């Protein structure tokens, strides 16, 4: 029985994966490639593996993709169909995914699960659940691989929030005021003065004559009236100040693990600090 161990975008990636399988003990006869691409001559000559051309799953007159996979993954050495679909080493719900991959021109790498090797292989992009995800292959490829390094950066946004308000009102207080005001009043004085004896117009003597003198004084009359003495002006202005924040962020750092003899690398080519 055969099982898919990886899906690849380019023939170069496929070659690298196949070479990795060969180094793990697989024979080229144990490895197959399924694709809808036509530019596979170099792949076949480089690896010696069989490349099977997948049919277009959307052609009604052709054998369906489902049946094609069924026939391909269940045929034995005599090319007889001896297995049922339920015995495939592939999940039924993955059929549509494989169909989309082939329609997109990708290459499916399959191995014979009965091959005598140390352990099954998965390049990390396998869709089948029959193989582990250990990435132990030492792939030989001239292509450069990139791994993005990410870090968290702080992003600070500002929004206006109401922290308080000021309300201005008035209240009446009573206080005592003291004032000194000058006032006038009449005071009585009585004097006896001598007169000229030669005056002859004196009235007859009797005891009924009286004189009256009014006595006047100023009295205070207190009235109150409101007057404006001050005014209160309320406004606001914007001031700017620095506010300190502190937060923990994560950052990815590259880590190089070497196993065995690796030539061409310095002690720390990644300059880890």
Curated annotation (Swiss-Prot):
Sequence segments annotated as region (Disordered): 241-273
Q: Which domain of life is it from?
A: Bacteria
User: What organism is this sequence from?
Assistant: Bacillus subtilis (strain 168)
Q: What is this protein called?
A: Stress response protein YsnF
Bias kind Basic and acidic residues: ranges? 241-264
Q: Which keywords does this Swiss-Prot/TrEMBL entry list? A: Stress response
Induction annotation: By phosphate starvation, via the alternative sigma factor sigma-B.
- Which InterPro entries does the record associate with it? DUF2382, GSP17M-like_dom, Stress_Response_Assoc
């Amino acid at each position: 029985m055969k099982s898919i161990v990886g899906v690849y975008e380019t023939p170069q990636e496929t070659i690298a994966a196949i070479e990795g399988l060969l180094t793990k003990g697989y024979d080229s006869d144990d490895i197959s490639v399924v694709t809808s691409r036509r530019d596979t001559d170099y792949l076949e000559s480089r690896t010696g593996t069989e490349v099977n051309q997948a049919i277009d799953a959307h052609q009604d007159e052709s054998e369906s993709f489902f049946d094609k996979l069924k026939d391909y993954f269940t045929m034995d050495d005599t090319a007889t169909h001896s297995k049922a679909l339920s015995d495939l080493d592939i999940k039924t719900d993955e059929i549509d995914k494989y169909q989309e991959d082939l329609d997109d021109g990708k290459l499916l790498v399959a191995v014979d699960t009965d091959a005598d090797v140390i352990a099954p292989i998965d390049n990390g992009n396998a869709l089948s659940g029959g193989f582990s995800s250990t990435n132990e292959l030492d792939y030989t490829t001239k292509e450069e691989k990139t791994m993005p390094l990410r870090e968290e950066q702080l992003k600070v946004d500002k929004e206006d929030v109401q922290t308080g308000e000021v309300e201005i009102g008035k209240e009446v207080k009573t206080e005592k005021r003291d004032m000194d005001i000058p006032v006038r009043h009449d005071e009585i004085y009585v004097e006896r003065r001598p007169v000229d004896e030669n005056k002859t117009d004196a009235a007859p003597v009797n005891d009924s004559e009286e004189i009256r003198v009014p006595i006047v004084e100023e009295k205070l009359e207190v009235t109150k009236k409101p007057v404006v003495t001050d005014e209160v002006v309320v406004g606001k202005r914007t001031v700017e100040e620095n506010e300190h924040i502190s937060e923990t962020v994560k950052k990815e750092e590259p880590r190089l693990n070497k196993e065995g003899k690796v030539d061409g690398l310095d002690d720390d080519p990644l300059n880890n600090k």
